[in-house]
């Protein structure tokens, strides 16, 4: 009976840790997505500024 309790406790601990890791993974994926969106926005802004500078030079 005691072995069964020890095994159940180990399974619960494993389950809890796995849930924590899944949550951390989701946070990392979200941060990665946000970084990509930020980089894309910065590239768009840089392109817009470059176009404006080119137009100003040609005027």
From Swiss-Prot:
Cell cycle recorded as keyword: yes
UniProt-listed GO biological process terms: cell division; mitotic sister chromatid segregation
This protein's record includes keyword Cell cycle: yes
Broad class of the protein's primary localization: nucleus
UniProt keyword annotations, A-Z: Cell cycle, Cell division, Centromere, Chromosome, Chromosome partition, Cytoplasm, Cytoskeleton, Kinetochore, Microtubule, Mitosis, Nucleus
Subcellular location: Nucleus; Chromosome, Centromere, Kinetochore; Cytoplasm, Cytoskeleton, Microtubule organizing center, Spindle pole body
GO cellular component, one term: kinetochore
Subunit structure: Component of the inner kinetochore constitutive centromere-associated network (CCAN) (also known as central kinetochore Sim4 complex in fission yeast), which is composed of at least cnl2, cnp3, cnp20, fta1, fta2, fta3, fta4, fta6, fta7, mal2, mhf1, mhf2, mis6, mis15, mis17, sim4 and wip1.
Protein function: Component of the kinetochore, a multiprotein complex that assembles on centromeric DNA and attaches chromosomes to spindle microtubules, mediating chromosome segregation and sister chromatid segregation during meiosis and mitosis. Component of the inner kinetochore constitutive centromere-associated network (CCAN), which serves as a structural platform for outer kinetochore assembly.
Record's protein name: Inner kinetochore subunit fta6
Organism annotation: Schizosaccharomyces pombe (strain 972 / ATCC 24843) (Fission yeast)
